[in-house]
Regions:
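Catalytic-site signature of metal-activated, phosphate-bearing donor transferases
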Residues: 7, 68-74, 91-222
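A conserved acidic beta->alpha catalytic loop
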Residues: 27, 39-49, 62, 86
Length: 364
């Protein structure tokens, strides 16, 4: 066992990232030993900004393939381990300190390190939506990226699961770039893997092409192949699509279909609650919101939302009970939600409402 410390190359691919790249690099430049930036066609000040941090800037002709660009970036790294980030990712102060500690203590037998990825944060700085990615890998293993879009890094060997969180702070609006890559691949006669089909459906939904997304999700779910976690997630997103189309029964059926793959998840129970709530079926909604708080947290899932198991369903139960005229219960669940997110604006709004309803305060 060797814990004498490691050296790290940071690899990033960029294109028109002038708004975020400095923020990203500021958080890691004093930790990593090398910064490698691959530019895929920036026309803004991205490269000018990057030059202040590293001389290792390489141009790569964009070929609608994120894996190709990432593999090129990895090929330019020279240190023992490679850390990868996107330009709109950041390491908060606690994560910076944790990475410094990991760098000094990591067992050199470790081939890959996974880290939590906080994709969406609430007003209290807590993650609303999380996943986990392999972020730090041993260079000599020559691990490769696969997939034109929503690429993944294939790793093997000795794995270490760390608690160093990478935080995503997206600045750009949703575009149809990824959707077009899938569409072009299909037009060129390329066969999509189940994973590609899953992400093609996600991109279609993100671009509000709900009918297209429904067909893609249904096709994916009807295949025997495919990871069960992606199947569970696809059921929920299919439910979202049907809800957007006003097909309420199909929306519930789609979410409930996820139960065939594992015990009910808080994310899909909360979804079903929203579907009934939108139809003003408040008792049914309360049932599903309550269930969301009782099922076990799927913390090992790459697609989990901690809020869907606690304050989010409690807050919706507050609204449902209020609609049913049960203000005592409504107040109770508002305060229960507040125990998780005390500074939430919706909770404060509800408190003002209840002050107008009650002559006295209630405690949880």
């Amino acid at each position: 066992m060797n814990k004498q410390g490691i050296t790290i190359s940071l690899c990033i691919i960029v294109r028109d990232e002038e708004k975020t790249i400095a923020r990203c690099l500021d958080g890691v430049e004093e930790i990593v030993d090398e910064i490698v930036v691959v530019d895929t066609g920036s026309v803004d000040r991205t490269k000018e900004i990057v030059e202040k941090y590293t001389p290792n800037i390489y141009d790569f002709q964009w070929i609608d393939d994120f894996s190709a660009a990432r593999n090129f970036a990895f090929s330019k790294a020279t240190q023992q381990y490679i850390l990868w980030l996107d330009a709109d990712d950041v390491l908060l102060e606690d994560a910076q300190e944790a990475l410094k500690q990991l760098k000094g203590q990591l067992d050199s037998n470790v081939d890959a390190v996974s880290m939590p990825y906080h994709l969406v944060m609430d007003s209290n700085g807590k993650p609303l939506y999380c996943t986990r990615r392999y972020r730090l890998v041993k260079r000599e293993k020559q691990f490769q990226w696969f997939g034109k879009v929503h690429e993944y890094l294939a790793v093997s060997g000795e794995i270490f699961n760390s608690n160093i969180a990478i935080t995503h702070k997206k600045e750009k609006e949703v575009t149809d770039r990824n959707l077009k890559i899938f569409q072009n691949a299909v037009a060129a006669g390329e066969e999509l893997s189940p994973r590609d089909l899953f992400y093609y459906a996600n991109e279609s939904m993100d671009n509000q092409k709900y009918n297209d997304a429904v067909l893609l999700y249904e096709t994916f779910l009807n295949q025997d192949e495919g990871w069960y976690e992606e199947k569970i997630y696809a059921c929920g997103k299919l439910g979202d699509c049907y809800a957007k189309l006003g097909l309420w029964e199909k929306a519930v059926e789609a979410c409930a279909k996820s139960f065939r793959y594992d015990v009910p998840r808080g994310e899909n129970c909360t979804r079903i609650g929203y579907i009934y709530m939108d139809q003003q079926k408040y008792n049914e909604a309360i049932f599903w919101f309550k269930l969301a708080t009782e099922v076990p947290l799927a913390k090992d899932s790459p697609f989990h939302s901690p809020a869907s198991y606690t304050w989010l369903p409690y807050l919706q139960m507050c609204i449902c009970y209020s609609k049913l005229g049960e203000q005592d219960k409504a107040y109770y669940y508002n305060e229960l939600a507040a125990s998780y997110v005390p500074n939430n604006a919706a909770i404060e709004y509800n408190r003002k409402y209840f002050r107008g309803v009650f002559d006295k305060q209630y405690k949880v």
